[in-house]
Amino acid sequence: MSHHIVEARDLHYIYADGTPGIRGVSFRLTHGESVAIVGENGAGKSTLLLHLNGYLLPTQGTLRIGDFPLTKKNLKSVRRTVGMVFQDPDDQLFMPTVFDDVAFGPLNLGLPVEEVETVVMQALETMGVPHLKDRPPYKLSGGEKRSVAIASVLSMSPDILVMDEPTSGLDPRARRRLIEQLKSFEHTKIIASHDLDMAVDVCERTIVIHQGGVTADGPTLDLLRY
């Protein structure tokens, strides 16, 4: 894989109703970076994140993930590389049990059934929730759901983790636990958030989005000093 594993050049996206989502976004991320994407509601953060896993394709410009330009033809390869954690865990948890949810991705990627249990339990243990494996997701707390949703992405062994508001709705203890877990991950991390304290703790770099464009890009402590 290329050392510069995420590169956006003049990225634009216009929704079907003509509303611009992002405008002229350019940046380059190198392997192992942790980058916060910050900005007000409606700035374009979520639109940008949805490009990184190929849920949206750019109207104009290019996006490269490792060795793959983001195109319809390369979606499978891009999605093996990038794991997406949505803001609402209920958007990711839909199977009868936690184990089934975390196993869903590896099975779809074609991992041999005999290996699936191992990767599922490793992912659950990484998030500190192996005891939840037989529970139905709808009976979990918000923090437990978030941990399981992240485990469901870790089980697919992505190189890059993309997260939308990972600390949203968590109580202080669950938030602090998640921050410590994120700091321990060696993945490249791209995290959209309004939680600026979390950004300072987890991300050495921050990209500021305003009205769909990049208005600042630099060290988190310099940009978010307050």
What are these regions, as identified by a protein language model?
Residues 193-194:
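H-loop/switch region of ABC-family ATPase nucleotide-binding domains
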Residues 53:
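Helix-to-loop junction immediately C-terminal to a conserved catalytic motif
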Residues 114-132:
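Conserved ABC ATPase "signature" region
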Residues 136-140, 144:
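Conserved ABC ATPase signature
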Residues 213-226:
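Conserved beta-strand-loop-alpha-helix hinge in the C-terminal portion
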Residues 161-164:
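Catalytic Walker B motif of ABC-type/P-loop ATPase nucleotide-binding domains
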Residues 38-40:
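The feature captures the beta-strand-to-loop junction immediately N-terminal to the Walker
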